[in-house]
Amino acid sequence: MAKIKKKGTSGQAKNYITRTQAVRKLQISLPDFRRLCIFKGIYPREPRNKKKASKSATQSTTFYYTKDIQYLLHEPLLRKFREQKALAKKIARSLGRGEVSDAARLEKNHAPKLTLDHVIKERYPTFIDALRDLDDALSLLFLFANLPSTSHVPPKTIALCQRVTHEFQHYLITTNSLRKSFLSIKGIYYQATIQGQDIMWLVPYRFVQRVNGDVDYRIMATFVEFYTTLLGFVNYRLYSSIGLRYPPKFDTRLDENGAELAAFTLEGRTVGDAPKAIEPAKSSSDAANQEVSAEVQKKVDNVIKKAGLDQASSEQPTETAEEVTDAIDKFETTAPEADTLPQPDMSGDQAGSLFAPFTFYISREAPKTPLEFILRAFGCKRIGWDTVLGGGAFTHNEADPRITHQIVDRPSLPESSLPSIPAAATDGGAVQKVKPGTRVPGRTYVQPQWVWDCINEGKLLRPDLYAPGATLPPHLSPWVNPKKGGYDPRASLAEQEEDGEADIDAEEESDEEMEEAGEEKPAPTAANESEDSEDESVDGGMDVAETDDDDSESEEEEEEEDEFAGIDDEDAGSESEDEEETARTQHQKELEAEAAGLPFSSSGAGDDAAAKKKSQAKKRAAKKRQEEEELERQKMMMSRKKRKLLEKMMYSNKKTAEESAKLRSKRRKIEKGAAGK
């Protein structure tokens, strides 16, 4: 006879363990258990049936895998947590005795230090695994780098986050790995490609942050501690891969001056500058080959001149050799109904040369930190800004003739309302000032959005569209492509509108205006009110029975209405014939006027235009009805399953088309209002 199984020895009761049981088994406190789970990447699990997993379970009971807790029993960090607990008891005992100096000595000399190196190696066996998990790490570290220091967020933590994030930004600048960026309500999104992995993170805007008490900063501080260690490992590996020393030199004086990225100095492992380790070194054999080829070319040219072969060679068509470049191929669609393939991003060489030939100056009101990072990541080496924004600039002189582009984010104001230059700045000061609102000749002025749109498009856009005070084009997400049949803000209305959509929209607007005008009726006059009251007083509030004469009159009126209804049907049937006759007569008059050499003018030009629009609307309706009938015939030949699938597709396409039509109508009204001004 088989042995009867006991309850709770198999199934969900064995696979899951509650948090209280796990804490008791590990013999640590609940905060230490949370830290340990965050470090090791162990998260709560939800069993299918909580009652089967534990008899006393409620809706708020937290479960973990039993194997995960068994795995934590052998974690070296447990010993550190126990040492911290024992040290806390000793410090509390010393404070209870009044031995403050002994308590301070114990905290300073005997506090155990946690190292997460082995945890990083366990969780990320390969470097690619670490890069894939870098999105959340960068977002949280950039968030803490912009937070104000409080009792929950110490300045030491903020400085550490700023240092590791700036080191990561320097790697992106050196290798031109940044690809896209987007300005959103939440902050600025960035996307970089490192060793084939796309990494995206969010950086908040530099506003005054108000730290609320609703957030548990102890949990976030644990994540920050883990992510700073992870990013330190990643930065070391990235810097080593391109031949740079890690960590880079850090100038405290420049950092206190607000230099930020300029406070770091990159050094190669060998003697020389950092960029030399990045640029492909030209070997001596290549230089020798170039010299030899130049000498050979000179000799060949002399021989050709002596032999008189220049004319003969010019007469023969020569094949132009195609230059071999590292440009990425683009796949263009061959038909409008074909699928659009996702285009590859630009390479690092193209990204590194986008802003290379320019010298930028960032005005005081523009966001310096993101602009400096993006411009440097896309090849710009010369960036200046005002002294108020900090040190480390290429120039602080706004009137420097080397500046080619200036980024301005202020409205265009009349010169009368602009302030004058201070007297101290005009008396031969070190930095020459430019009067606010004035423009330096030969310099291109753009708004900050121009920089973001250029890097997302991978090319330089027209700067006149982004001039100060101009209405900016829509700033769209580079990761969202317009769907087929959807609304595309970048395309014109003429490219997206359907046949007669603008006319239908105009007719609807005119009908709405007429309805609004009809609702505004004049108030009834006193004479009309008196007549109505007299009519009511005749009846005297009594119901009067109808006579036979009244019945006969009502029957005659009904017969007359029936006769008129028949006449209306006949008129409706002959409307098309009248329209054809009118069009034929109109055409005959035009021919006669043309033969006589006189301009044709008709009093009913407006009526003709209205009739023409009406006929076009009828043609469109007939065409649409014909297409619907054809579609119904095709659906009849389908199976039930395919017909249901087609109906679902048509429903979703109809919703998309309706939403696109609403957006186009809204845009049409905006453009019409702007044109009216």
Curated annotation (Swiss-Prot):
Compositionally skewed regions (Acidic residues) per UniProt: 495-518, 529-538, 545-581
PROSITE patterns on file: BRCT
Gene Ontology terms describing biological process: maturation of 5.8S rRNA from tricistronic rRNA transcript (SSU-rRNA, 5.8S rRNA, LSU-rRNA); maturation of LSU-rRNA from tricistronic rRNA transcript (SSU-rRNA, 5.8S rRNA, LSU-rRNA)
Keyword set, alphabetical order: Coiled coil, Nucleus, Ribosome biogenesis, rRNA processing
Superkingdom of the organism of origin: Eukaryota
Disulfide bond entries: none
Designated name of the protein: Pescadillo homolog
Source organism (scientific name): Emericella nidulans (strain FGSC A4 / ATCC 38163 / CBS 112.46 / NRRL 194 / M139)
Gene: nop7
